[in-house]
C-alpha cells in the first residue's frame, strides 16, 4: 500500500537510485 502515493513512491525510487537521486535531491 502507499505505492501510488507520491511520498512512498519517491522514497522507494530514492532507495533504488539513492546515489542518482541523492545528487538531484541535494540540488533541489
Curated annotation (Swiss-Prot):
Keywords: Ribonucleoprotein, Ribosomal protein, RNA-binding, rRNA-binding. Signal peptide: none annotated. It comes from the Bacteria. Disulfide bonds: none annotated. Residues 11-28 have a biased composition (Basic and acidic residues). GO terms for molecular function: rRNA binding. The keyword Ubl conjugation does not apply. Residues 1-28 are annotated as: Disordered. Protein S19 forms a complex with S13 that binds strongly to the 16S ribosomal RNA. This is Small ribosomal subunit protein uS19. It comes from Phytoplasma sp. (strain STRAWB1).
Amino acid at each position: 500500500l502507499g505505492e501510488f502515493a507520491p511520498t512512498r513512491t519517491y522514497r522507494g525510487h530514492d532507495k533504488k537510485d539513492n546515489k542518482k537521486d541523492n545528487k538531484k535531491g541535494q540540488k533541489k
